[in-house]
Regions:
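Short hydrophobic beta-strand that contains or immediately precedes a catalytic carboxylate
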Residues: 79-81, 88-92, 99-101, 177, ...
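Signature of the N-terminal lobe/flap region of pepsin-like aspartyl proteases
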Residues: 61-63, 69-167, 173, 296, ...
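Short conserved beta-strand and strand-loop elements enriched in small hydrophobics
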Residues: 77-81, 133, 145-154, 208-210, ...
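Acidic glycine-/aspartate-rich tracts in secreted/extracellular proteins
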Residues: 104-107, 184, 229-231, 289, ...
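Extracytoplasmic, non-cytosolic globular domains
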Residues: 273-302, 306-310
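Aspartyl protease catalytic domain
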Residues: 23-70, 150, 155-269, 347-353
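Aspartic protease catalytic domain
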Residues: 22-38, 51, 162-167, 225, ...
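Cleavable N-terminal signal peptides of Sec/SRP-targeted secreted and luminal proteins
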Residues: 4-24
Length: 451
């Protein structure tokens, strides 16, 4: 083997190793935390119609510090930042776009445990670019930094992230956020775009599922960078994304939502968007649809009508818990009741659904316990694979009015075309037959000629 052949072999070997690494699946374990200090509902009463100025008939909030069911969890990823490897536990959040931690001098009403000290990292650099983020559970602001981040053990990458000078963040036992939404004002600062830039994946694809992991005994969830083999199976389904003004969330078009058990199924048709948010531990419904849910829960034995026409919501046992059913694209996704309800400290089950004033549905961690969900920023689609307790029922695709018109028009043109072809073919055959027919008197003419 000559020298050039050796160099070629070495080059091919390095290329194949690099290609296999880039295309391989990277696993990041996720760890659950109990969500405290967030209002939960027990013995809910709501007037109909809802009057926010009427304290007597409004919503009653209580603090359920002991609540700890499957649905009542958020999930953390462990990372290290800086030359000294300062450790942080960050909430995985597909509802925002940037990674941020608190500065060591961070002020505000926050419960951040670990804070970043730029002075102890020789590689930290303040970019001077300001950021301001708002969440349902708080807000933060500060400046973007550039430093090494280790989210894969023993591998560091130079990345941008936010360092908060002020944080009003009410979720306990965490140090910040890993934002994984599709886009932001500057793509260079989006975490998932930085993953691709550093060659960790050959496309803007990652997936999330919340269940016990064999490779990490204390983890109860995992994030995969790259496309997992689940999504090549026949049970997996794809749904196109929809885009919202100003900012792109991971969202699809919701066509209906309802509750069901073995004997009863109640649902309503909607035309709105459904946002998938790993940073939310509940199912959030628009207010006008939440009232429908309150009515339906009484039909399942999970509530009663009050004298003021409000509703008192409770579930006495696990047997009475209805399933939540979401329909988007042409698929019904069923979340079992044990994931859609909390068990309160007083022994009653509380629906994990809450309401907000806007017209958008937000589905949180209950969904990811039963569906392995893939976020594909390259093809602008979401993919879902049912886990142990998840059910996907696929129906026929709903066609738009324009598509129906085209199909009907095309069908008419096709039928008319076939009819014309048959007509002219028959006509041509008849004309040909008429030319080949011998007249009855032709023998008499010839006889007279030779006579």
């Amino acid at each position: 083997m000559n020298l050039s052949t050796k160099f070629l072999s070495i080059y091919l070997y390095i290329f194949l190793i690099s290609a296999s690494f880039i295309s391989s699946i990277i696993e990041i374990p996720l760890y659950p935390i109990k969500v405290k200090g967030i209002p939960k509902y027990e013995n809910i009463s709501i007037s109909e119609p809802y009057d926010p100025n009427n304290d007597n008939n409004g919503i009653t909030f209580i603090e359920e510090g002991n609540t700890f069911m499957n649905a009542n969890k958020l999930f953390l990823a462990k990372i290290k930042i800086g030359s000294q490897g300062q450790e942080f536990n960050l909430i995985l959040d597909t509802g925002s776009s940037i990674l941020w931690v608190g500065r060591n001098t961070c002020g505000g009403e926050h419960t951040l445990i670990h804070k970043f000290n730029p002075s102890t990292s020789s590689t930290a650099r303040n970019t001077g670019q300001y950021f301001d983020m708002k969440y349902g559970s708080g807000a933060c602001n500060g400046f973007y930094y550039n430093d090494y981040i280790e989210y894969i053990p023993k591998r560091r990458f130079n990345m941008y992230f936010g360092v908060a000078d002020t944080a009003n963040f009410k979720v306990e036992n965490c140090d910040g956020i890993i934002g994984l939404s599709k886009d932001y004002a500057d793509e260079r600062l989006s975490f998932i775009h930085m993953l691709r830039e550093h060659g960790n994946t050959d496309s803007l694809v990652f997936s999330v599922k919340f269940e016990s992991q064999e490779f990490e005994p204390y983890a109860q969830g995992v994030m995969y960078i790259g496309e997992h083999s689940d999504f090549s199976k026949k049970e997996a389904v794809s749904v196109p994304m929809v885009f919202q003004a100003n900012k792109i969330f991971w969202a699809c078009e919701l066509s209906s939502f309802g509750l069901k058990n073995n004997d009863y199924y109640s649902h309503s048709d909607y035309e709105t968007n459904l946002i998938f948010d790993t940073g939310t531990n509940v199912i959030i419904l628009p207010l006008k649809y939440y009232q429908d849910v309150l009515k339906d829960l009484t039909k399942f034995g999970c509530g009663s009508l009050l004298s003021n026409n409000g509703y008192q919501i409770f579930c006495g046992s696990n047997d009475t818990l209805p399933d939540f059913v979401f329909k988007f694209d042409r698929h019904n996704f069923t979340i079992p009741g044990k994931y859609a309800f909390y068990l309160s400290s007083s022994g009653v089950y509380i629906s994990s659904a809450i309401f907000q004033e806007s017209g958008t549905f937000i589905i949180g961690t209950p969904f990811f316990f039963v569906f392995h969900t893939l976020f594909d920023a390259y093809n602008d689609e979401l993919k879902f694979y049912p886990l142990k307790n998840g059910v996907i029922q696929s129906g026929s695709r709903k066609l738009s009015t324009v598509a129906i018109i085209f199909i009907v028009f095309g069908g008419i043109v096709f039928v008319v075309g076939i009819a014309l072809i048959i007509y002219f073919s028959v006509k041509k055959c008849k004309e040909k037959q008429n030319k080949n027919i011998i007249p009855d008197n032709i023998g008499e003419d010839y006889y007279g000629l030779y006579k």
